[in-house]
Design a protein with these regions (language model features):
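...with weaker cross-activation on analogous glycine-rich loops/strands in unrelated enzymes
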Residues: 250-311
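Low-complexity, Gly/Ser/Thr/Pro-rich intrinsically disordered linker/tail segments
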Residues: 313-332
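Boundary regions of SH3-family modules and the immediately adjacent low-complexity/disordered segments
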Residues: 1-12, 19-27, 38-97, 110, ...
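Short, well-ordered loop/turn sites that connect or cap secondary structure elements
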Residues: 30, 36, 119, 271-273, ...
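Loop/turn positions that initiate beta-strands
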Residues: 39, 119-128, 191, 274-275
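Short alpha-helix capping/helix-loop boundary micro-motifs
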Residues: 22-31, 104-115, 260-269
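Active-site nucleophilic cysteine motif
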Residues: 213, 217, 228-248
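Asp-box/WD-like beta-propeller blade repeats and closely related beta-sheet repeat scaffolds
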Residues: 93-131
Length: 332
């Protein structure tokens, strides 16, 4: 029987291997591949201490997981809250998403409250109902439930509706394309995924969606580059682009390439529009229009989320990237 879990730390490291490091030509390096955020769901493919389908034994402290957006990896047991399918199905419609770069969960609905947890943009919290008189007494604050059973408070302005779907966590299987898994969970066709997201959140407007994706990406400007990162603490190139799309309701492939079975497909360079993805060898950026793009770069000169340009006349021009640009991807 399939098992499930919820990420129970503000930022959860997802490793590409059951061990946290590996030897490379450069020396010992991390095996980090991604990060899960508090409140997000995953499928547990192999329980801690079990043996994977490939015959790899896991330590009692490590689980093999697949995130709701299709990323496969390994997570420490103590970073997960294991739940039944019924419990997860009950949970998924409830959370709201945090939209600030960092949000404190406080013990009281006032700034002097004890800080219980510090969460990142993209983390999820469930708001608790309150009697009208209690809610009126602390207008501007929302009472929320933490995964460990405690309750706390955050500012109402920090919470927004979740635009992305996590239901693919139930239908993902080996050999099934991600779009097909999500479509199956929602009882629609894969071709309806993007149009339905636009209809639900942007009145069907492609232009509004493109604007929203670019605005989301710009919220990370100045964030440090972190290999495998996907939060305001540090983010990598594909973490930036996939997070911008996710927060706008469309789940794309997590890494820096176009993969069949996901919404992004290649289009001619001349057809690129703001919100499309630019692909370089091992790198991805988000096109902002007028020749400029935003990306998270590990280059020593910047080392984080910056804006650069495809235009040689622009002071933000990066010749090295322009020369290696090999594809433009779009969900339209």
């Amino acid at each position: 029987m399939m098992q499930y879990a919820i990420f129970a730390r503000p930022v959860v490291t997802i490793y590409d291997l059951p061990q946290t490091t590996k030897q490379s030509e450069a020396g010992l390096v991390s095996t980090i591949g991604d990060e899960g955020l508090y409140g997000q769901a995953c499928q547990v493919r192999t329980a801690p201490g079990g043996v994977t389908a490939e015959g790899v034994p896991l330590s009692p402290e490590v689980a093999e997981v697949v995130t709701f957006y299709g990323y496969h990896g390994f997570v420490r047991r103590d970073a997960l809250k294991f739940v039944s399918e019924d419990a997860l199905r009950d949970y998924l419609p409830r959370p709201l998403v945090l939209v600030g770069r960092a949000t404190d969960v406080l013990s009281l609905p006032k700034v002097q409250g004890v800080r219980m947890l510090e969460l990142e943009r993209g983390c999820l919290l469930c708001r608790l109902p309150e009697p009208p008189e209690e809610a009126l007494a602390h207008t501007g604050w929302a009472k929320v439930a933490l995964l460990d059973g405690r309750t706390g408070y955050v500012r109402e302005v920090a919470l927004e509706p979740v635009r992305f779907e996590m239901t693919a966590v139930f239908s993902q299987r080996e050999g099934l394309a991600f779009d097909d898994a999500l479509a199956k969970a929602r009882n629609i066709t894969a071709g309806e995924l993007v149009p339905q997201a636009l209809q639900a959140w942007y009145h069907g407007s492609e232009e509004a969606f493109r604007d929203a994706v670019c605005a989301q990406a710009k919220k990370y400007l100045g964030t440090e580059y972190r290999w495998g990162g996907k939060s305001g603490r540090g983010i990598d190139c594909s973490g930036l682009v996939s997070s911008a799309y996710m927060q706008c309701g469309v789940l794309i492939y997590r890494d820096a390439r176009i993969v069949e079975g996901w919404p992004v497909h290649q289009i001619p360079f001349a057809d690129k529009k703001r919100g499309d993805a630019l692909y370089f060898p091992g790198h991805i950026a988000l096109y902002l229009g007028e020749g400029r793009y935003i990306h998270s770069t590990g280059a020593s000169a910047s080392g984080g989320v910056v804006i650069n340009s495809l235009d040689p006349a622009d002071p933000l021009y990066r010749e090295d990237l322009v020369k290696s640009l090999y594809a433009v991807g779009s969900v339209f």
